[in-house]
């Protein structure tokens, strides 16, 4: 049996313990999925004892803080405790993130005068907060598409979903600190 110990840390404004945070240990293996819960103490410490060691299993810890899921994959067989689970304060100020790079590739132009375009956008949150768009549609992470674009396909590591908005699409996801790629492709008629 294994012991998993870690610390819940709020990174907004410094590294402070997140007292009382409910932390979930996840174990995924061929025999199924098992969850266990622990509460972070006054020092942000959480501990799971009696964790079954299963060869080939995947492990992780997660917590929901201010409505946002934070998590980290772990390897309890490695001798590098404690696990650090970082959380951040939620804000709806879109200055928390920026577009750091954008590329447009015309991948193919075919006979019926149709282009296949691929756009790759790098979104970065360099702040110590998590951007949460709230209910205002104008606060969503929005992307414009050219007139006549069709067959949109969106791929990103950001959570949430892509929804259609006027003149393009938007992502409903929060943006935690870090860097994320948003890739989308579409077909476009040309003359």
Task: Show the residue positions of the predicted features.
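Lumenal/extracellular ectodomains and adaptor appendage modules
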Residues: 1-191
């Amino acid at each position: 049996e294994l012991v998993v110990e870690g610390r819940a840390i709020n990174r907004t404004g410094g590294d402070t313990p997140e007292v009382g945070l409910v932390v979930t240990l996840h174990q995924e293996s061929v025999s199924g999925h098992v969850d266990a819960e622990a509460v972070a103490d006054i020092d942000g410490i959480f501990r799971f004892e009696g964790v079954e060691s299963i060869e080939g299993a995947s492990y992780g810890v997660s917590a929901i803080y201010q409505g946002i899921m934070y998590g980290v994959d772990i390897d309890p067989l490695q001798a590098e405790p404690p696990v650090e689970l970082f959380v951040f304060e939620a804000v709806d100020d879109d200055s928390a993130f920026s577009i750091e790079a954008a590329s447009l590739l015309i991948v193919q132009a075919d006979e019926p005068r149709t282009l296949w375009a691929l756009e790759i956008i790098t979104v970065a949150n360099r702040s110590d907060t998590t951007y949460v768009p709230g209910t205002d549609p104008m606060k969503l992470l929005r992307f414009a598409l050219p007139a006549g674009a069709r067959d949109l396909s969106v791929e990103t590591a950001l959570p949430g979903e892509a929804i259609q908005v006027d003149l393009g699409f938007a992502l409903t996801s929060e943006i935690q600190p870090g860097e994320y790629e948003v890739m989308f492709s579409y077909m476009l008629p040309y003359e």
